[in-house]
Amino acid sequence: MANQVIRCKAAVAWEAGKPLSIEEIEVAPPQAHEVRIKIIATAVCHTDAYTLSGADPEGCFPVILGHEGAGIVESVGEGVTKLKAGDTVIPLYIPQCGECKFCLNPKTNLCQKIRVTQGKGLMPDGTSRFTCKGKPILHFMGTSTFSEYTVVADISVAKIDPSAPLDKVCLLGCGISTGYGAAVNTAKVEPGSTCAVFGLGGVGLAVIMGCKVAGASRIIGIDINKDKFAKAKEFGATECINPQDFSKSIQEVLIEMTDGGVDFSFECIGNVKVMRSALEAAHKGWGVSVVVGVAASGEEISTRPFQLVTGRTWKGTAFGGWKSVESVPKLVSEYMSKKIKVDEFVTGNLSFDQINKAFDLMHSGNSIRTVLKM
């Protein structure tokens, strides 16, 4: 099949705001420096829903969404040297070419090699590998895991331990890695520190896990849904609070609880007002606040400059700061050695045909991650 078109099932988003449609598509062979992957498992993330909603300024249709997946290499294009058919892999929405100035700088993981074409929903040569009903279908985040087969750039693939369970480690393609890395890489949480995590979805839970691994002594979870508190405590939160239970602002509450503010705070929602609260809950002189959540297009953050003049630091993170190709295999190893949790993020499994139900579960607030088995 290596040089042939593959016919398979995919969940196509024909237009914004409509449910995904399971269709038969054609997947073209990989071109030079591309890899065709048989997806074994994929999860549904809020980023997929954000683009499907039509709110994403980079969102283009028709498209095959999905960016938390894992699978097996089916074939490779010309010039691919580090991967071969049969390799177990996780596709990556932030690549690592190893050559651009971003890859060569230890301070960032934001490889720019294929950014322009990826943002347009195309492969690096400016075309698509997907066709449905005679029409080209766009790629998404360079991964498009909502398909039985996908084609990705060879710099957007992490080769992992073949014994890893793909219906679990697919989650390391986005949410868990993002939250965990926000704590250990971006914030660099210190032993004995006090942390506050705003938003207790999958990413927030991963931040809590990272804070615990880093040795934080106090981890305060914050959410308006108290049903999420028990799970947060399982992941390492020492206490949880609901902002709606207080008459004063949440930053005032946290400052009182912590004798002046927290050492590290994390916004895992994508709400610019909460981003301000998280910054202002950080301790004067040394507090660090990390923006993890992705705000809607056009939103702006604000605070009084005095908050920064008096020693607080405001930072952002993408994919937890991990240089992807080299780091994801290590994260899989950490999971296999039980240093980090992954299984506990999976709240359900569904067949691929039930993908729209997985979106409904996510919107209900009762699920962390639903994994689809292809």
From Swiss-Prot:
Positions bearing N6-succinyllysine: 233, 315
GO biological process, one term: response to nitrosative stress
The record's free-text note on cofactor binding: Binds 2 Zn(2+) ions per subunit.
UniProt modified residues of type N-acetylalanine: 2
An example Gene Ontology CC term for this record: cytosol
Residues with Phosphoserine modification: 247, 324, 351
Locations listed in the record: Cytoplasm
Catalytic activity reported: a primary alcohol + NAD(+) = an aldehyde + NADH + H(+); a secondary alcohol + NAD(+) = a ketone + NADH + H(+); S-(hydroxymethyl)glutathione + NADP(+) = S-formylglutathione + NADPH + H(+); S-(hydroxymethyl)glutathione + NAD(+) = S-formylglutathione + NADH + H(+)
InterPro entries the record matches: ADH-like_C, ADH-like_N, ADH_3, ADH_Zn_CS, GroES-like_sf, NAD(P)-bd_dom_sf
Keyword vocabulary terms for this entry: Acetylation, Cytoplasm, Lipid metabolism, Metal-binding, NAD, Oxidoreductase, Phosphoprotein, Zinc
The protein's Enzyme Commission number: 1.1.1.1, 1.1.1.-, 1.1.1.284
SUPFAM superfamilies referenced in this protein's UniProt entry, alphabetically: GroES-like (SSF50129), NAD(P)-binding Rossmann-fold domains (SSF51735)
Sequence positions that bind Zn(2+) 2: 97, 100, 103, 111
PANTHER family per UniProt: ALCOHOL DEHYDROGENASE, ALCOHOL DEHYDROGENASE CLASS-3
Protein name as catalogued: Alcohol dehydrogenase class-3
Species this protein is from: Rattus norvegicus (Rat)
Organism placement in taxonomy: Eukaryota, Metazoa, Chordata, Craniata, Vertebrata
